[in-house]
Amino acid sequence: MSQFKRQRINPLPGGRNFSGTASTSLLGPPPGLLTPPVATELSQNARHLQGGEKQRVFTGIVTSLHDYFGVVDEEVFFQLSVVKGRLPQLGEKVLVKAAYNPGQAVPWNAVKVQTLSNQPLLKSPAPPLLHVAALGQKQGILGAQPQLIFQPHRIPPLFPQKPLSLFQTSHTLHLSHLNRFPARGPHGRLDQGQSDDYDSKKRKQRAGGEPWGAKKPRHDLPPYRVHLTPYTVDSPICDFLELQRRYRSLLVPSDFLSVHLSWLSAFPLSQPFSLHHPSRIQVSSEKEAAPDAGAEPIPADSDPAYSSKVLLLSSPGLEELYRCCMLFVDDMAEPRETPEHPLKQIKFLLGRKEEEAVLVGGEWSPSLDGLDPQADPQVLVRTAIRCAQAQTGIDLSGCTKWWRFAEFQYLQPGPPRRLQTVVVYLPDVWTIMPTLEEWEALCQQKAAEAAPPTQEAPGETEPTEQAPDALEQAADTSRQNAETPEATTQQETDTDLPEAPPPPLEPAVIARPGCVNLSLHGIVEDRRPKERISFEVMVLAELFLEMLQRDFGYRVYKMLLSLPEKVVSPPEPEKEEAAKEEEAIKEEVVKEPKDEAQNEGPATESEAPLKEDGLLPKPPSSGGEEEEKPRGEASEDLCEMALDPELLLLRDDGEEEFAGAKLEDSEVRSVASNQSEMEFSSLQDMPKELDPSAVLPLDCLLAFVFFDANWCGYLHRRDLERILLTLGIRLSAEQAKQLVSRVVTQNICQYRSLQYSRQEGLDGGLPEEVLFGNLDLLPPSGKSTKPGAAPTEHKALVSHNGSLINVGSLLQRAEQQDSGRLYLENRIHTLELKLEESHNRFSATEVTNKTLAAEMQELRARLAEAEETARTAERQKSQLQRLLQELRRRLTPLQLEIQRVVEKADSWVEKEEPAPSN
């Protein structure tokens, strides 16, 4: 809401000024900028929308509501005059049709807003709004009359379309080609719930007036979106108009002349830029001491005619990117957490200037760097090294390659007009990365420096001094404190929280605290970036993204060339005749049961059994069996549609438009069952016509993942064709269509279900004229015949110590050895992590074993005591038994004697009783 407050106080020069008289209110006149527009402005907005502005239709929640306007999802502004039907309440779910206009202060403005009717009544009443009475609602003594939410017949339709058009937002096929908009940035989102709401209404109306209940929770799939530019990425120069055409939301400075794309010659198609080497750059915290600067930041004789800047790349390396892609492919059965996209892992180290993220670099100094930067290319390299050392603390003098990435030209006004040139280099930062031994030594040094302040807890400092890195610290704490495996993990997390964060496990270059690391996704795709980004950073991020698009697209092109073509065998006439005869016989046999079923009544017709796969039985066709049909005709058989609750067959008969997304005739939606609950598993069940023996390299998987912005797992045919057409190798539309058909099934390429392995590229056996498309057929340009080919030199032989050395071959060999070394280092690092984990588990198991052994000794002692007690009790028992037997033996004669005495006493009593009577 801060942006709306700023809008009231200081309207931007590009903001829209609403005209017309404002309706008075009890609170006074409304804000002038937020006055409802008149009819003429609405018609102008409609003309703007027809002129190519971006639109999107989505469902959102009303997060803010005021007297004259509201906000949906804290980013889409809507006037209350565009609300159709009942006014929404705060927190309600609404259907929004919004338009994007970068010239306004608030770029996203709603054109239509409608409250959804399939949501429960809100507990809290709506806030009192002053415009309720003005909109025609009658008020009584107790206030406004309450309205029921569930009144769908009173709400006018927002998009009057046929019912079938609502089903095109399938969860299995998101056919919203959101990348067709030329402006860079978020391309909108498609409403995923409208078709399901319509579906559930129809089912419950047919079911006989069942109460409207809550829908079952289900897994919402991300919308389909690709990273793709709508133009060919081979233009060597971009002027002011070209930049505005490519990037409409970019603010170009007024003194800008042109930018030369030097990366086209530095990284041709035959030698693309490689992400194989990991180059991690980390910004140190404010507490750590910054490294000393090597030179003064601004020399006295600096000349703005030439400036040198560097693009410091921070990348995890190709192995880490492969690992994320393989995690995505391996989680097909049980999708868990979505891995991070490559665009979010590729980052750039930028400096700060007046709260703005800028490139690292500065102006040329003749006294420090050299005299002639135009003749000597090392002059600007020295400038870049000096400025990078002063601004970031990173010494780039150890970099072996300096690629000229782009060259900006500005016009300095004044009586002597001057041309200012800014050269941007891309150095190989991975060559100055510390080795594992150096990194471990640095971590030990930092651990030793951090140990003295933490002397209050001696039990915690001992493992810190002994451990060389964070893993050994965790192992020592687990040995000391853990008693069971579960307690081990809990105590490790508890003890790590109050301590200082451990150093990263992977080697990295440490930069000064004033710098910032921004990902490529955050610069290009983020609508509301946290950092203010300069013009040059935005352009370079777009150019770097276009370079990656060309390189990954070329990998897809080479992969398609290596795959065999699909052979479609036409049906034989003899088999067709035999199939016709069999079907005629079947029709005659089936006629009699059908007649009997019709006599029984219409109830039996609706009880026809379904097949085992859940599909209705198809009527017999005269074209032969289904297996013998070509795939092109198979899509035509999906034209049937049954609106049964257990079946939904969708088909597109022509181009329809919903939410700014066009559907093509060739794009047929897949089959879904289970009461129209579209699931992603139906995509995996599609037939795969790719040769099972064709195993693709991992770089093809990475290329597919790069274009798939939201990890949907598939790419559309149209997007694959456009990827090939934007490479700059001048392919025709028919060539692209034939190549794409090798991996496409039903207009979709399910790259997630293909087979991949760690092997080299597939362009080894392909001829050169095929690799460069149709460039050899076109007339040569002014500079070179093949722009994609590497510039040819006279000879790569250099005389050294009396012998000729092939420098190109040596460089290639060194590159191969470096790649092998990196792979082995990654494997060793992985094994070290596994070994350390096993060591931690072993230590925890040792502690558990010791605890169990102590418990066992205690139990043994208690068992011995119990046995001794049992023996004592047994002895006492036997003794008592003997005493009882002896007492019994002695008491028996005494008992007999007492019995005799009693009998005698009784006899005497009987004798004495009759005497007194005489």
Swiss-Prot record:
List every position bearing Omega-N-methylarginine: 180
Q: Which InterPro entries does its entry note? A: BURAN, CCAR1/CCAR2, DBC1/CARP1_inactive_NUDIX_dom, EF-hand-dom_pair, LAIKA, S1-like_RNA-bd_dom
Segment Disordered: which positions? 1-35, 179-219, 446-510, 568-637
Q: Name one GO biological process term.
A: rhythmic process
Modification after translation (UniProt): ATM/ATR-mediated phosphorylation at Thr-454 upon DNA damage promotes binding to SIRT1. Phosphorylation at Thr-454 promotes its sumoylation by switching the binding partner of CCAR2 from SENP1 to PIAS3.
Q: Which UniProt keywords apply?
A: Acetylation, Activator, Apoptosis, Biological rhythms, Cell cycle, Coiled coil, Cytoplasm, Cytoskeleton, DNA damage, Isopeptide bond, Metalloenzyme inhibitor, Methylation, mRNA processing, mRNA splicing, Nucleus, Phosphoprotein, Repressor, Transcription, Transcription regulation, Tumor suppressor, Ubl conjugation, Wnt signaling pathway
User: Which residues, by range, are in coiled-coil regions?
Assistant: 824-904
Locate the Phosphoserine modifications and list their residues.
124, 569, 622, 670, 673, 676, 682, 803
Q: Where in the cell is it found?
A: Nucleus; Cytoplasm; Cytoplasm, Cytoskeleton, Spindle
Q: Which GO terms describe its cellular component?
A: chromatin; cytoplasm; DBIRD complex; nucleus; spindle
Q: Which Pfam families match?
A: BURAN, DBC1, LAIKA, S1-like
For the cross-link Glycyl lysine isopeptide (Lys-Gly) (interchain with G-Cter in SUMO2), the position is: 586
Q: What is its main location?
A: nucleus
Q: Region (Interaction with NR1D1): which ranges? A: 699-918
List GO molecular-function terms, semicolon-separated: enzyme inhibitor activity; RNA polymerase II complex binding
Q: Where is this region: Interaction with MCC?
A: 605-665
Glycyl lysine isopeptide (Lys-Gly) (interchain with G-Cter in SUMO2 and SUMO3) crosslink, residue number(s)? 586
Q: What are the Phosphothreonine sites (modified residues) in this protein?
A: 35, 454, 484, 892
Q: Where is the composition biased (Low complexity)?
A: 447-468, 482-492
Q: Which residues carry this modification: N6-acetyllysine?
A: 112, 215
The record's annotation in PANTHER family points to: CELL CYCLE AND APOPTOSIS REGULATOR PROTEIN 2, CELL DIVISION CYCLE AND APOPTOSIS REGULATOR PROTEIN
UniProt function note: Core component of the DBIRD complex, a multiprotein complex that acts at the interface between core mRNP particles and RNA polymerase II (RNAPII) and integrates transcript elongation with the regulation of alternative splicing: the DBIRD complex affects local transcript elongation rates and alternative splicing of a large set of exons embedded in (A + T)-rich DNA regions. Inhibits SIRT1 deacetylase activity leading to increasing levels of p53/TP53 acetylation and p53-mediated apoptosis. Inhibits SUV39H1 methyltransferase activity.
Q: What is this protein called?
A: Cell cycle and apoptosis regulator protein 2
